[in-house]
């Protein structure tokens, strides 16, 4: 019989916490079983394989991550939403490096995979933030990839203690967010119709007096 108190959800939560502690690449069913005080075969009554455990952790991570960003940007727009969302991502990766790594590595296994809905939560929050900059819809994917690349790189480097120069890391993060904000504002301006062009066309359409 499965150990009382263990469920697929509780095993997943325990695996996620352990991944944060020791690193996702060090997580195994055997190590998790030892942490939970059970024999490894007992875990397979709740989670069928190492791969399923990793996938469950990924779904949990992306759900938490999406909710963290959504809550951070609620009621904000423009640079305020950008800064809040970016800080939420930075904090999540720092606090949960193992489960974030699981989420970043996972891929959907089919159209009904809950990972798709979990990932959509993240994308929806970032998309809402970007629309505050009035970027053309066709350009949003490029902006999204830029955000992911920069913020993922910074957050994972920081979580791995990768910044060794004495310059304050918070100052660097603020500088990066300001830089992204200016870039997004410039992209929006670049794609807006020229007010001079509009006024000229209006003037041309006026009847001669």
Residue ranges and their predicted role:
Residues 8-16, 20, 25-26, 37, ...:
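An amphipathic alpha-helix adjacent to DNA-recognition modules
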Residues 109-137, 141-146, 167-182:
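Amphipathic alpha-helical packing segments from all-alpha helical-bundle domains
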Residues 56, 70-101, 110, 123, ...:
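Hydrophobic alpha-helical connector segments
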Residues 1-6, 188-209:
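N-terminal intrinsically disordered/low-complexity leader segments
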Residues 30-34, 43:
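Append "Primarily bacterial transcriptional regulators
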Residues 94-113, 156-164:
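Amphipathic alpha-helical segments used for helix-helix packing
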Residues 39-41:
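Key DNA-contact positions within bacterial/archaeal DNA-binding proteins
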Residues 149-166, 180-192:
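Amphipathic C-terminal alpha-helical segment
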